[in-house]
UniProtKB/Swiss-Prot annotation:
Keywords: Isoprene biosynthesis, Lyase, Metal-binding. Its EC number is 4.6.1.12. One of its GO terms (molecular function) is metal ion binding. It comes from Mycobacteroides abscessus (strain ATCC 19977 / DSM 44196 / CCUG 20993 / CIP 104536 / JCM 13569 / NCTC 13031 / TMC 1543 / L948) (Mycobacterium abscessus). The keyword Acetylation does not apply. Pfam families: YgbB (PF02542). It catalyses: 4-CDP-2-C-methyl-D-erythritol 2-phosphate = 2-C-methyl-D-erythritol 2,4-cyclic diphosphate + CMP. This is 2-C-methyl-D-erythritol 2,4-cyclodiphosphate synthase. HAMAP family: IspF.
Length: 158
């Protein structure tokens, strides 16, 4: 009998840093300011990592890539996702699918949604759907002071 699927959720929020490259969904948005962070500040990739780790019961981004781990300083969200994919496989899990929603006014995700979905799906070896929303001017994302992301993931034990 197959094990039941496991679901995880992940969130991430970072303030905008003037002049920092904007990495989001594994993509560079060259005309936008990026987010502060120990790594590249890609809130979507970090939320996906958290969702995958949560679903597999393997901790969270802070435990795996935290500031106490200097080897991960400045690392790309894409590299983090590849590492998490390998960690899940090494622990007997297969990724079924994932979804990530970016919360913020900029950058505009819609024009690059297909590109992001293809990249992220390739990185984790499973379908990833991408969406985006705003907070209608409320909170730090609404004021353009930061970006947030929420992700879910489905995994099964092999």
């Amino acid at each position: 009998m197959n094990a039941l699927p496991r679901v995880g959720i992940g969130t991430d929020v970072h303030p905008i840093e003037e002049g920092k490259p904007c990495w989001l969904l594994g993509l560079l948005f060259s005309d936008e300011n990026g987010c502060e962070g120990h790594s590249d500040g890609d809130v979507a990739a970090h939320a996906l990592c958290d969702a995958l780790l949560s679903a597999a019961g393997l901790g969270d981004v802070g435990a795996v890539f935290g500031t106490g781990r200097p080897e991960w300083t400045g690392v790309s969200g894409a590299k983090m996702l590849s590492h998490v994919r390998d960690l899940l496989h090494d622990n007997g899990f297969q990724i079924g699918n994932a979804a990530v929603q970016v919360i913020g006014n900029r950058p505009k995700v819609g024009p690059r949604r297909a590109e992001a979905q293809e990249l992220l799906s390739g990185l984790i070896g499973a379908p990833v759907s991408v969406s985006a929303t705003t907070t209608d001017g409320l909170g730090l994302t609404g004021r353009g002071e930061g970006l947030a992301a929420v992700a879910t993931a489905l995994v099964t034990a092999l």
